Design a protein with these regions (language model features):
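SAM/dcSAM-binding transferase cores
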Residues: 94-140
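Conserved Class I SAM-dependent methyltransferase catalytic core
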Residues: 39-96, 101
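Residue-level detector of flexible, active-site-proximal loop/helix-junction positions
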Residues: 2, 89-92, 107
């Protein structure tokens, strides 16, 4: 990403970045690269998203709640603003663990929604099934 300079911008960038910021890296280097932000900090994602997006482009990302809030605050410096925020709850009554965020250059108020993953152990919500059925075989 740091050395990627395409001739044109992108209308949509979708990212599932490394989550772990201040934790012990895994002994396996490949696993650490995928899970820890050491080589790709979230702030750098914003810099590159702003650079790579078209004027009406969307940057979509999933992060733990705390990191997502920090990313939103940092994104404002680069004139990227939350357009959609989905709070992902593990099950009913639990606080959200993740945020799905869509950032754009528009300064409109964000559309906020909630998504519950499981209604009970291994009993997934209809919304979650609809969202993941094309990716997870067990969701058919």
């Amino acid at each position: 990403l740091q050395a990627f300079f395409p001739a044109i911008g992108y209308d949509c960038i979708l990212c599932n970045p490394p989550f772990f910021v201040h934790s012990t890296p895994a002994p396996d280097n490949g696993r650490s690269l995928a899970r820890h932000t050491g080589t790709l900090p979230h702030t750098e994602l914003i810099v590159h998203a702003e650079r790579l997006l078209t004027p009406h482009g969307k940057f979509q990302v999933i992060l733990p709640v705390e990191e997502a809030c920090q990313l939103i605050a940092y994104a404002r410096r680069y004139h990227l603003f939350p357009r959609k925020i989905t709070r992902v709850h593990p099950n009913p009554g639990k606080a959200p663990k993740r945020l799905l965020i869509q950032l754009t250059r528009q300064t409109l108020p964000p559309v906020e929604t909630d998504l519950t993953v499981e209604l009970s152990r291994h009993h997934y919500s209809e919304e979650y099934i609809a969202l993941t059925r094309e990716f997870y075989l067990k969701m058919e």
